[in-house]
């Protein structure tokens, strides 16, 4: 099965199953993150504005959806969810969901019940938090990633520039922000599939008119960071992905396109000669079909088939 789920701004989700098939409507609203159960392509988790979350299932040709947003206890501070609140499925168990508000929540039963596994991982400055319905909440989580190698090794990043790691499934968290640019929006955190101590972070400062690209790598769980932005032209970095077949190949999406590095981030090349200069929001690599799916803002979905040509450049 080759499937893509995407959303259209101020509209709904769309999905297709194979290249030759037309797009079909899927449930959703003002779309942000979504995840497909890898064991059941008819089960889709989709988030919406301010961290709302639902699970949708296709049965007998009909979609049914259930709100599964976690709740806080009586007397606890209200939840703060970014417009793009992060939701991921565990690579070790598709029934395990992680959802980021100002806390990290975990469900082990497809969203039926939730456990809060962190404290507030943001700066939580009341003077700048913002309050609905007058402002989009600030001091919220924006990125989550669990190691494909080790269950419970989880990273979280926030819109105010903080990054944390837990190595024990949320029992203890360690801040690993030192060495990263201060107070920048964490657009993506990616735990490596090749080495459990390696993690990548992209940040951007477009919200304060900083158009630099911030791309960092750590090989010691975030204790120290190295700048791997290389020769990418200035432009906020939105996403980074490892190649699933060749260690050292990295793909980066920025406000102006897609770049590939064949040497672990030392140098980059433009990828996709006919791809228009546009905001690239996400990148996904289909592991079986070896295609790169590029999600843009305003220019649709693009694919680059047969990444072998890129992978063969690395011995």
Predicted stretch roles:
Residues 1-315:
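Beta-propeller blade termini and top-face loops
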């Amino acid at each position: 099965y080759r499937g893509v789920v995407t959303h259209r701004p101020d509209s709904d989700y769309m999905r297709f199953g194979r290249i030759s098939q037309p797009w079909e409507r899927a449930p959703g609203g003002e779309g942000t993150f979504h995840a497909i159960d890898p064991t059941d392509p008819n089960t889709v988790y989709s988030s919406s504005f301010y961290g709302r979350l639902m699970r949708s299932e296709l049965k007998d040709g009909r979609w049914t959806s259930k709100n599964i947003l976690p709740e806080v206890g009586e007397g606890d501070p209200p939840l703060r969810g970014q417009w793009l609140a992060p939701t991921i499925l565990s690579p070790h168990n598709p029934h395990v969901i992680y959802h980021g508000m100002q806390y990290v929540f975990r469900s082990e039963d497809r969203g039926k019940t939730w456990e809060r596994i962190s404290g507030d991982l943001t700066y939580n400055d009341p003077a700048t938090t913002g309050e609905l319905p007058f402002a989009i909440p600030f001091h919220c989580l924006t990125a989550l990633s669990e190691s494909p190698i080790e269950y419970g090794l989880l990273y979280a990043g926030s819109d105010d520039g903080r990054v944390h790691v837990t190595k024990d499934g949320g029992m203890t968290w360690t801040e690993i922000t030192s060495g990263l640019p201060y107070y920048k929006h964490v657009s993506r955190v990616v735990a490596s599939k090749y080495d459990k101590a390696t993690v990548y972070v992209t940040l951007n400062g477009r919200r304060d008119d900083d158009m630099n690209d911030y791309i960092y790598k750590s090989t010691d769980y975030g204790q120290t960071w190295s700048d791997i932005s290389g020769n990418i032209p200035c432009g906020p970095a939105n996403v980074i992905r490892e190649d699933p077949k060749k260690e050292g190949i990295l793909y980066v999406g920025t406000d102006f396109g897609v770049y590939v590095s064949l040497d672990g981030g030392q140098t980059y090349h433009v990828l996709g000669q006919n791809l228009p200069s546009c905001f690239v929001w996400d990148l996904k690599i289909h592991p079986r079909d070896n295609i790169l799916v590029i999600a843009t803002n305003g220019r649709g979905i693009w694919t680059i088939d047969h990444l072998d040509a890129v992978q063969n450049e690395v011995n």
